[in-house]
């Protein structure tokens, strides 16, 4: 009667405090430059070493520029954070993939692609989108800086056991509908608090038919529904993705791992605290129109009106519409845009670049659009060039930048100017997220590509 979550959680329990939290063993800690400095400072103050340095992997991503990475970072705060991570990793004997290192990239892209993330693991990082790794059949969630220090010192963390939710999506996804659209659709129905307090398992035929990278996108956005994390049971798709990668088990170790991994699925009689179901046929290419990821709609639909909303909801909705410069009830099709961003830990993988390139091939970037195409890692960048995707993009008028979090958040040079519209494949569209006054519309790589070549919001199915 155990869920996938139960099986992994229970296998990692060290002890449970009566009427209190669980001491949970952690298999993998990822550290980036923004949330780790105080944790390492705390260890120094108390004279504590990192208990299991081989379990910790560090890399800068939030502050890294996406051009001229071989030169010093100009912003003093960003430079200090990146340099501090380098020093901390060296001082404490930790694996560190610095800027320009061939294994560097966004931490939630590098972990899975290097098979540092594996099924059955418990994984934490001082970053909310750590839930991405759950796509591999792991328990993965973001933690605070004090908890990062706790894991560095003890390889354990104190956590209250969350409730479980299963979201089942059955059926076949339609033309032009991607994992990003599935996630945005879920949020539009469940809101940004619909999964608060839960750890979500995604299931159903539509989920099983997603590629590994599609599942990573889906789990990445779990936190935007309020969930503690999201996960997908490992299957042949997972195993084929992992096999032969750099840190994957080899030989007899692979056989032993596979034997265990195949047990990582919810039992047929498993009981979840909540069950939610969706039909894949109801999902079309999505786009957001407001200032939280739950404010999304099918690209052919109109922005909702305030009819039926409570007073508080109306105030919030009107504030969002004012910020975005939209009117209730209007369509976004044909709306002129200024920027397109392909990248982030949500959609910065090779499949995302393949999708984008497939739609822009033989076309040209619209003159009114500034496009930032940012690989999620140097491995993705190398694969782009190996497959000739860079040539397709260059011929269409696009340029590929260097890996990093880039325009997902305004912590580096890639900021959207105030008042400008950005069709972005990232994960958050909060006010000012991409820069003070920036207006963000979240979408899939296909929707972003359609906007990039037409200069306006366009249904990608019209170009496919």
UniProtKB/Swiss-Prot annotation:
Keyword Metal-binding found: yes
Transmembrane segments: none
UniProt record, GO biological process: L-leucine biosynthetic process
Cofactor: [4Fe-4S] cluster
Alphabetical keyword list: 4Fe-4S, Amino-acid biosynthesis, Branched-chain amino acid biosynthesis, Iron, Iron-sulfur, Leucine biosynthesis, Lyase, Metal-binding
InterPro entries: 3-IsopropMal_deHydase_lsu, Acnase/IPM_dHydase_lsu_aba_1/3, Acoase/IPM_deHydtase_lsu_aba, Aconitase_4Fe-4S_BS, Aconitase_4Fe-4S_dom, IPM_dehydratase_rel_enz, IPMI_cat
EC category: lyase
Residues binding [4Fe-4S] cluster, per UniProt: 345, 405, 408
Note on how the cofactor is bound: Binds 1 [4Fe-4S] cluster per subunit.
Catalyzed reactions per annotation: (2R,3S)-3-isopropylmalate = (2S)-2-isopropylmalate
MF terms (GO), sorted A to Z: 3-isopropylmalate dehydratase activity; 4 iron, 4 sulfur cluster binding; metal ion binding
Pathway: Amino-acid biosynthesis; L-leucine biosynthesis; L-leucine from 3-methyl-2-oxobutanoate: step 2/4
Record EC number: 4.2.1.33
Assembly information from the UniProt record: Heterodimer of LeuC and LeuD.
Homology family: Belongs to the aconitase/IPM isomerase family. LeuC type 1 subfamily.
Function recorded in the entry: Catalyzes the isomerization between 2-isopropylmalate and 3-isopropylmalate, via the formation of 2-isopropylmaleate.
The protein's name in its UniProt record: 3-isopropylmalate dehydratase large subunit
């Amino acid at each position: 009667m155990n869920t996938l979550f139960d099986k992994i959680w229970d296998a990692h329990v060290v002890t449970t405090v009566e009427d209190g939290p669980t001491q949970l063993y952690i298999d993998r800690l990822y550290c980036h430059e923004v949330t780790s400095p105080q944790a390492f400072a705390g260890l120094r103050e108390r004279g504590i070493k990192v208990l299991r340095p081989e379990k910790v992997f560090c890399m800068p991503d939030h502050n890294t520029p996406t051009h001229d990475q071989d030169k010093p970072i100009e912003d003093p705060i960003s430079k200090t954070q990146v340099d501090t991570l380098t020093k901390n990793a060296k001082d404490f004997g930790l694996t560190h993939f610095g800027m320009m290192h061939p294994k560097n990239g966004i931490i939630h892209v590098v972990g899975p692609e290097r098979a540092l993330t594996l099924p059955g693991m418990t994984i934490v990082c001082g970053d909310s989108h750590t839930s991405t790794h759950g796509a591999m059949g792991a328990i993965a969630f973001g933690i605070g800086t004090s908890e990062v220090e706790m894991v560095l010192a003890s390889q354990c963390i104190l956590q209250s056991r969350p409730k479980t939710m299963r979201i089942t999506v059955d059926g076949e996804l339609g033309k032009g509908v991607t994992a990003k659209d599935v996630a945005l659709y879920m949020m539009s129905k469940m809101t940004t608090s619909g999964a608060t307090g839960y750890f979500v398992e995604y299931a159903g035929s539509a989920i099983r038919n997603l590629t590994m990278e599609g599942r990573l996108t889906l789990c990445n956005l779990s936190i935007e529904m309020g969930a503690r994390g999201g996960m997908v049971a490992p299957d042949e798709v997972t195993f084929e993705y992992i096999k032969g990668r750099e840190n994957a088990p080899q030989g007899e170790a692979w056989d032993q791992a596979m034997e265990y991994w195949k047990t990582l699925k919810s039992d047929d009689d498993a009981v979840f605290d909540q069950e939610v179901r969706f039909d894949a046929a109801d999902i079309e290419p999505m786009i957001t129109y407001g200032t939280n990821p739950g404010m999304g709609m099918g690209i052919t639909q109109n922005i909702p009106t305030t009819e039926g909303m409570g007073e508080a909801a109306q105030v919030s909705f009107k504030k969002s519409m004012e910020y975005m410069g939209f009117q209730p009830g209007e369509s976004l099709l044909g709306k002129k845009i200024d920027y397109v961003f392909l990248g982030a830990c949500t959609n910065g993988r090779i499949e995302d670049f393949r999708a984008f390139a497939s739609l822009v091939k033989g076309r040209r970037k619209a003159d009114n659009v500034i496009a930032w195409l940012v690989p999620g890692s140097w491995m993705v960048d190398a694969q782009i060039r190996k497959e000739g995707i860079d040539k397709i993009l260059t011929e269409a008028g696009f340029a590929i930048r260097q890996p990093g979090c880039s325009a997902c958040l305004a912590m580096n040079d890639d900021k959207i100017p105030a008042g400008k519209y950005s069709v972005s494949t990232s994960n958050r569209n909060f006010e000012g997220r991409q820069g003070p006054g920036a207006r963000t519309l979240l979408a899939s790589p296909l929707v972003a590509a359609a906007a990039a070549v037409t200069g306006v919001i366009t249904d990608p199915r019209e170009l496919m």
